[in-house]
Amino acid sequence: MLRSCDIDAIQKAYQSIIWKHEQDVKISSTFPNSAIFCQKRFIILTPELGFTHAYCRHVKPLYLFCDRQRHVKSKIAICDPLNCALSKLKFTAIIEKNTEVQYQKHLELQTSFYRNPMFLQIEKFIQDFQRWICGDFENTNKKERIKLEPFQKSILIHIIFFISVTKLPTLANHVLDYLKYKFDIEFINESSVNILKQKASVFLVPRRHGKTWFMIPVICFLLKNLEGISIGYVAHQKHVSHFVMKDVEFKCRRFFPQKNITCQDNVITIEHETIKSTALFASCYNTHSIRGQSFNLLIVDESHFIKKDAFSTILGFLPQSSTKIIFISSTNSGNHSTSFLTKLSNSPFEMLTVVSYVCEDHVHILNDRGNATTCACYRLHKPKFISINADVKKTADLFLEGAFKHEIMGGSLCNVVNDTLITEQGLIEFDLFRYSTISKQIIPFLGKELYIYIDPAYTINRRASGTGVAAIGTYGDQYIIYGMEHYFLESLLSNSDASIAECASHMILAVLELHPFFTELKIIIEGNSNQSSAVKIACILKQTISVIRYKHITFFHTLDQSQIAQPFYLLGREKRLAVEYFISNFNSGYIKASQELISFTIKITYDPIEYVIEQIKNLHQININEHVTYNAKKQTCSDDLLISIIMAIYMCHEGKQTSFKEI
C-alpha cells in the first residue's frame, strides 16, 4: 500500500511529466474590440491593447507595462474607484469581421513562446538560480540569502543572454525582453544588449572575490535545466580543474538527487529524457581533450596563466557561432606576461570588464599618498571577508614592493609619465600676452557666443575639490578666457545648488556687463556627481540671467534613462581628447586670457591667471594598460578650475549645436 505522502509525490511527478511543455500563460485572451480610425499601414497589434496606432510604440511606459504584465502570473490589483471609472468607458466596436481572427492568430503566436520547450528550460534555470540565492538548496534550518557582486551578476547575464539567443534564434526578441524583465535591466539600450550577446567576454577581478566559486553553481544549474548543453571548463592547473569538477559533481548530487549523474574521464553527465547534458573539465596542460568538441559555453579560469599553446586551442572556438567563451582572471599587473588581456581595452568590441578598487583617474593616489587604499570617487561594495586598510598595504609592500597595488588592489599597469606636457614658452606667453576684450578695434572680430562650463562640487573640504566655472569665447582660431571661478561651499547647511548657481551667475552677468556684444550663452553643467542638482542649477541660472540680461540662453542636454533630454552633461572618455586638444592649442599659443577677466572667488591679491597656471603645471600623463589618461591633482592642489577651462574650450571646439536647447 502507498502512504498518502507517497501518493501526493507520485501525483505531483506525474502531473509535471504531463504538463512539462505547457504553461499557464496570463496573456489576456479577451479581444479588445475597440475601433481605430487611421490608415492600415499605421495600425499595430498588441495582445493587451488590441489594434492601436503605431505611435503608441513610442509611449514607453505603456508598452513597458504591457511587457511586464505579460510575464507576471498574478493579476494586477486595481482600486475600486479606478475600476468603476474604467468600466464606464465605452469604445466604438470594430465593423470588420476578420479582425478578431487576426487578433487570435497574433495571440496564439505570443503564447506559443511561453510554451516553447527551450524557453521553459531557460525559465527553470532562472528559477533554480533564484532559489539558490535564497538558500533553498541548503539543508540547514537557517536559510541565508547569498549576495552576489555586480561582476557575478554580469557574468550570469552574459551567459544566459547568449545561450538564449543561440537556442531560440527565431524568438530572440521575445526571450530578450523576458530576460531584461527578469533581471530588472529594462533600462539598457540595444547596444548594451549586443554586448551581452557577444561571443567572447573577459572579466578581470581582484583576488578572493569568488570568481571560481560562482562558476560552480552556474555549471550545475545549466546541466540540470538545459537539455543537451555542452560546457567546457579550462583551468591553469590540473588540480584546480579537478577540484572544480568534484565540487560540481558533489553539488549536483546534493541539489538534484533524483537526476542520473555520472562522472567519468573528467566529464560530468546529467541524463535527460532524450539527450544528455555534459561538462568537460581540462587543464591548460591537456587541451587535446577540448579539441573537436562543440561547446555552448567555454569557461577559461585564470586566463592570464594559461599556456600560450593552450590559448591558441581555446581561440579556435571563436569562429563557432554557438559558443560563448568567458575569460576570467585576476587583475595581476606586476608582469606584462600575466596581464596581456588588458590589451583588449582597445578592442572595437566592448568585451573587457575590469573590476578595480581604484579608477584610472585616481590610480596615482596609491603612490602619492602613503595610506591611500581606496578611490576618492568610488563607493566600494566589497565582500565581508575582504578587509583593506593601511596596515594591509604596509604589510604587503614589506613582503614584496608594489604587491599591494599590483596583486591586491587589482591595479592596472600604471606609469606616470614625467615628460613635459606644457612648454615653458607656452606658460610665459599665456601669462604675459593678454587681449583687451573691451577695445573697440578687437570687438568686431570676437565670437558672439559665450561658452560656460560648470563642474559642481558639493563639499566644504578645500583639500578635496571645489566647483570650477569657466567662460570661454573665440577670436578667430584662438580661445579667450573671459571668466573663471573656483568656488567652495561655506557650509554644508547651505543650499549647495543655489550657492553654486549664484556664484556662476555673478560671473556671467559681470562678463556680459563688460562685453555686451555676446548674443548667445551656451551653458554646460556637468552632472556626473548629481544629475538632479545639475538640473536645479540650470533652472536657477536661466531665471537669474534672463531677468537681468535678455540673452538667448541654451543648455547642453543629455538623454536620461527615460530617454528624456535633461540640462546636464556627463563627462566620459572624451576627457582625454579634451586634454590633448587643450595641450596642443596651449603650446601653440592659441589660448589667451582677457585683460578684463572676471573672478570673484580667487583672492584679490592673487592673479587668477597665476592661480590657474599652478594647476596647468601639475598636468601629467598616466599610462594604464596602454590606455592614456591625464591628471593635474596634487596633495595640496586640485584641478577643478583647469578641467572646467579644458572642457569649455573642447565644447566650444566641438560645437554640438543640436545638443544645446532652451529650458
Swiss-Prot record:
Keywords: DNA-binding, Host nucleus, Hydrolase, Viral genome packaging, Viral release from host cell. It is an enzyme of class 3 (hydrolase). Disulfide bonds: none annotated. The keyword Membrane does not apply. GO terms for biological process: chromosome organization. It holds the Pfam family DNA_pack_N. One of its GO terms (molecular function) is DNA binding. Its EC number is 3.1.-.-. One of its GO terms (cellular component) is host cell nucleus. It is found in: Host nucleus. The active site is at E302 (for atpase activity), D455 (for nuclease activity), E526 (for nuclease activity), D640 (for nuclease activity). A motif (Walker B motif) lies at residues 297-302. A motif (Walker A motif) lies at residues 205-212. The keyword Chaperone does not apply. Interacts with the terminase subunits TRM1 and TRM2. Interacts with portal protein. Component of the molecular motor that translocates viral genomic DNA in empty capsid during DNA packaging. Forms a tripartite terminase complex together with TRM1 and TRM2 in the host cytoplasm. Once the complex reaches the host nucleus, it interacts with the capsid portal vertex. This portal forms a ring in which genomic DNA is translocated into the capsid. TRM3 carries an RNase H-like nuclease activity that plays an important role for the cleavage of concatemeric viral DNA into unit length genomes. Belongs to the herpesviridae TRM3 protein family. This is Tripartite terminase subunit 3. It comes from Human herpesvirus 7 (strain JI) (HHV-7). The lineage of its organism: Viruses, Duplodnaviria, Heunggongvirae, Peploviricota, Herviviricetes.
